[in-house]
């Protein structure tokens, strides 16, 4: 099965941020996760922009959906068919301008090795407490 990351950039309607966030977290994501192949979702709020693509500069919220399927178009067909129905009601608190980017996963998720980080920190004269679990 092929793995994908689908990025959705969105904004709330001005003055409706609380309604937008409540709907997105408690209604929309659970609805999207009922679609076969969409296995996880994580939401993010922009805290800083350090250059990059000006086309996405106006968005404050990002959701990354993890998808596992051999039929990506079929997953999106189901998603589009359900949007705005009782199976996936949309909110008037989401601004109509959105951006969608889909990526194929090329390798496994790589995690830092705490022992390796500690060894490197010690070699650089950094205190081990700077990378302890308590401070992470």
List the model feature ranges, each with a label.
Residues 1-136:
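Macromolecular interaction modules
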